[in-house]
């Protein structure tokens, strides 16, 4: 696996959309991590394991024999292996926290919905993997069904190097 040279200044993530039942990930012979559960995604920051001077070796060991991982039993056979997509992604040093349960790092819910009013809750985390502080602008835009902008909200934030910033925004309309 040869990585582009322009990825050297980025964070590199490996995401498995699903591998049943237990997966162990290795890069260049070094263990990156494990994930148990064949129905959920997992994401690993593989940046410290990447080589940009030579091709990389990526190995994913998948084991479906484990009896301690739900579902414990069923009336059918649990086939093993990687059965959904695998993604390799490079992002800037400041990014949404991608290793948060294999998500994209943003969670949107509608805790209150009626004919008169709706509430949208947006939450997540931003990670600064750089050594220095970063000044960022967090913006969310809510669109009407016709594509016009219903609401925009901006927030200026500063994140120290190596820190994780949690955000939570609730809007009502």
Question: Where does each model-flagged region fall?
Answer:
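Ser/Thr- and Asn-enriched, surface-exposed coil loops between beta-strands
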Residues: 8, 38, 114-118, 161
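Short, hydrophobic beta-strand segments
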Residues: 46-48, 168-173
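Short beta-strand segments of immunoglobulin-like
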Residues: 105-115
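Conserved long hydrophobic alpha-helices within structured protein cores
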Residues: 55-59, 161-170
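Beta-strand-rich binding/interaction modules
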Residues: 25-27, 116-158, 165-169
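Accessory beta-strand-rich segments of carbohydrate-active enzymes
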Residues: 1-99, 103-105, 129, 139, ...
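Charge-dense, low-complexity intrinsically disordered segments
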Residues: 73, 159-161
